[in-house]
């Protein structure tokens, strides 16, 4: 094991002639039948209002070529999640309530520029059919889905766009996983359901080629039957079939439109590495990721219960390692959109994820996630909530220790996200040049085994006492790249025996 010393640096037309002897009498030219003019198809109406976005390499970009990362929230349209504000499939009451919520959210100062819209199965379920599972596809009614796509979902999408927000549509319900299912399988009834849903949505005249609207193909696939016949979520055999499964849906959509598509992973949208080998083909494609405390080696107060995380974590570094292993391979080739994430201390019982904001580079979940996302440079993300009224009720008034609430506790996601999203939208005020740079938690020397990884964390401290993480902005060089390789965002990889200075 070798020691590595770190220091930071910054016709032609052919004319056939015949002899007189072989000349034939000239035949009179018969006029051609006049062609009946063909009706030209009417040009498609362009419904988009927001700046056009597209996928370019690993980034989401606008027409100026600028990288765009979106920040948003979620809405679903079941009365159960909306204070039972309507009953009996009352479209107007649903629209009225949710538009009021959007107005309240904007008035509260939230800086959202996209929404994840659940095409909730409350509207498309045929309740005369037997119940099989929570939010299952087994009771799907195409007739009802078409009706409420026209009457509810598209009008609501138009309202979001009028407020400056892109819309990411998510299909009704969740992927099958528990009995009577073991997961999903190429050619199964759920794949046929998704093909039908996206065939309908991608041909809708107000959605087709409308760049304000994007598609998240499915919600939380867990296991898939691999090419080896075994169900799982991480093996090469599973991702070989995941590529086939979702490629067919991508191809169906692309036969109609070019809207941006977000492809889910496996294991509740936490496993993606296999897609680096079994790539989804086509343009305007990114990956939709879920992230909760305890996943990816992150800190949590309590396990969220899916069986893919834990109630312990190793602070920043173990979180970063887990992210790099499970999401990193696709983040290197395509943009990422985190379509579910939240956290709050366990005592509030207000979020799916139980953890604290913590400190970037240290303990906790929220600040470390933001740090990882910011360093990646191509991650859009949101506040996963089913309670819009809480966002509308938010007040930007600090709480007092001992009297904090879910909404104003700095260790819960609403307070942190409100201010972070504001910074993303308005920019960060930097008070002059930094007074000093700090390498967080570093020693003068460090040893790494071959193939070992370590993450530098660079903090800038300003004269007014404020500080911010600047790792992604720092220039970090190795004195010997044959020994120690420096990857973006402070990642150091030991590639050969020897010594190197950073």
Where is each model-derived feature located?
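Aromatic-lined substrate-binding rim segments of carbohydrate-active enzymes
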Residues: 91-176, 193-194, 245-257, 353, ...
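Extracellular glycoside hydrolase catalytic/binding regions
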Residues: 50-53, 77, 81-94, 106, ...
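N-terminal carbohydrate-binding accessory modules
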Residues: 27-116, 128-139, 425
């Amino acid at each position: 094991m070798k020691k590595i010393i770190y220091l930071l640096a910054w016709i032609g037309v052919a004319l056939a002639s015949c002899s007189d002897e072989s000349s034939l009498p000239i035949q009179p030219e018969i006029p051609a039948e006049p062609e009946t003019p063909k009706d030209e198809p009417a040009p498609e109406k362009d419904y988009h209002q927001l700046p056009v976005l597209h996928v370019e390499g690993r980034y989401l970009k606008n027409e100026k070529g600028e990288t765009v990362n979106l920040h948003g929230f979620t809405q679903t349209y079941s009365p159960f999640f909306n204070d039972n504000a309507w009953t009996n499939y009352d479209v107007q009451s649903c629209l009225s309530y949710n538009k009021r919520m959007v107005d309240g959210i904007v008035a509260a100062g939230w800086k959202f520029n996209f929404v994840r819209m659940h095409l909730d199965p409350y509207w498309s379920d045929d309740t005369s059919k037997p119940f099989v599972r929570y939010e299952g596809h087994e009771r799907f009614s195409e007739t009802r889905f078409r009706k409420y796509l026209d009457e509810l979902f598209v009008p609501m999408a138009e309202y979001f766009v009028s407020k400056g927000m892109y819309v990411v549509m998510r299909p009704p319900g969740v992927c099958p996983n528990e009995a009577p299912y073991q997961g999903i399988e190429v050619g199964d009834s759920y794949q046929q359901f998704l093909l039908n849903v996206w065939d309908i949505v991608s041909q809708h005249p107000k959605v087709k080629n409308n760049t304000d609207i994007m598609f998240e193909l499915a919600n939380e696939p867990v296991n898939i039957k691999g090419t080896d016949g075994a169900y799982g979520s991480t093996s090469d055999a599973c991702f070989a079939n995941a590529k086939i499964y979702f490629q067919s849906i991508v191809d169906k959509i692309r036969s109609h439109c070019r809207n941006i598509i977000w492809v889910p992973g496996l294991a509740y949208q936490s496993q993606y590495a296999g897609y680096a080998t079994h790539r989804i083909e086509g343009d305007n494609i990114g990956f939709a990721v879920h992230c909760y405390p305890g996943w990816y080696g992150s800190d949590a107060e309590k396990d969220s219960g899916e069986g893919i995380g834990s109630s312990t974590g190793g602070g920043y570094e173990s979180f970063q390692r887990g992210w790099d292993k499970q999401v990193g391979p696709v983040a290197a080739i395509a943009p990422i959109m985190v379509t579910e994430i939240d956290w709050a201390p366990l005592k509030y019982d207000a979020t799916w994820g139980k953890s604290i904001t913590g400190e970037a580079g240290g303990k906790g979940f929220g600040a470390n996630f933001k740090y990882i996302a910011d360093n990646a440079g191509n991650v859009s993300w949101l506040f996963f909530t089913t309670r819009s009224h809480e966002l509308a009720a938010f007040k930007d008034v600090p709480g007092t220790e001992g009297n904090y609430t879910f909404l104003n506790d700095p260790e819960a996601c609403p307070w942190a996200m409100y201010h972070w999203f504001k910074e993303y939208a308005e920019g960060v005020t930097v008070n002059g040049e930094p007074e000093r740079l700090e390498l967080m938690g570093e020693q003068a020397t460090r040893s790494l085994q071959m193939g070992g990884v370590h993450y530098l964390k660079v903090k800038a401290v300003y004269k007014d006492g404020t500080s911010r993480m600047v790792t992604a902005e720092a220039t970090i060089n190795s004195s010997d790249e044959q020994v120690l390789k420096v990857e973006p965002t402070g990642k150091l990889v030991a590639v050969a025996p020897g010594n190197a200075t950073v």
